[in-house]
Amino acid sequence: MAELNVKRSKFDRKLDKIKELEESGQLKNQNVNRTLRKFLNNKLALAGAGIFIIILVASILAPLLTSYDPLKADMNSVLQSPSANHFFGTDKVGRDVFSRVLYGGRISIFIGLGSALGCALIGVLLGCYGGYKGGWFDKIVLHISEVFMSFPQLVLVLLLVTILGQSLTNLIVIFILTGWGSVYRMARSQILTIREEEYVQSLKAFGLNEFLICYKHMLPNAIGPIVVNITLSTAMFILQEASLSFLGLGVPLEIATWGNILNAAQDMFTLQNNWWLWLPVGITISLFVMGINFLGDGIRDTTDPTQQG
């Protein structure tokens, strides 16, 4: 009996210690530090983050890195190969390709990241509430998402571009309309798993507002896969913009984007003889997408409980 009391006493002391750590925030800080340490030990994730940051910062600081206007034609400098004056050469109307890659990155990254965040906002709001609440609301939204996801996304995008017309705003709206379903299903799946946890049932028993339970207490525990989805969706939308613009169906040609730069290299003569029109931007797109994928994989490995060491 005395031995049992000693064990209980030790257990109570450990429990009190955990409560003290939680109240002081030390336990949360320890978890954050452990997660950060795991991420910093992932070399591919660090490489991806580095590539992502370098290209993003270079695009943002484009006016400081080049003095050329990406839209201004110069018929005296047509199709010049790379040189000290034009690092990536010039295109068919004399525009500086280096300048167009930097400024085009602004628009392409904005399209990719803006579309991914828009999908996440809609998908998370609907998925979290639907997964928590269930009932008729969940069934209706689930069926709507199934309708959108029953079509190949690129085919649906092409159809909507034809109907709505080509513009920067239309393209982002179309990407969000066709892409929110995957985030919704992911968020819904996470919440369906979490909603049976004891702490959720306790919050319900105390009569806490269901929106607070859903978005304040449950969502943070499901945020890891959602962040990963945002990174991977950003890469996907950038590639889709490049593909559509290459075909002449994306952003209007007068706007510099990575896809519109590739649009100038559609003929075999250009591919063989004017490599600087497509190779630099092609490498930039490949590096950026690869960097985002490495970063997303690193975040997934870091936040996945089954991967915790």
For each feature predicted by the language model, list its residue ranges.
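Conserved G/P- and acidic residue-centered "switch" motifs that form tight phosphate/ATP-binding loops
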Residues: G123, G127, G207, P220-A222, ...
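Hydrophobic alpha-helical interface/terminus motif in multipass membrane transporters
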Residues: L126-G130, L160, A187, V200, ...
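Short helix-capping/hinge motifs at transmembrane helix termini and TM-loop junctions
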Residues: A62-D69, G131-G135, V161-Q166, T178, ...
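Short juxtamembrane loops and helix-capping segments at transmembrane helix boundaries
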Residues: S150-L158, S243-N274
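Gly/Trp-centered helix-boundary motif
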Residues: M1-V124, W136, G250, E254, ...
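Amphipathic cytosolic juxtamembrane alpha-helices at the membrane-cytosol interface
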Residues: R95-F110, G114, G134-L142, R195-E196, ...
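Hydrophobic alpha-helical transmembrane segments in multi-pass membrane proteins
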Residues: G50-I54, S108-G123, S150-L158, G224-E241, ...
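Generic hydrophobic transmembrane alpha-helix motif, especially the helices
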Residues: F87, D91, L121-G123, G131-I194, ...
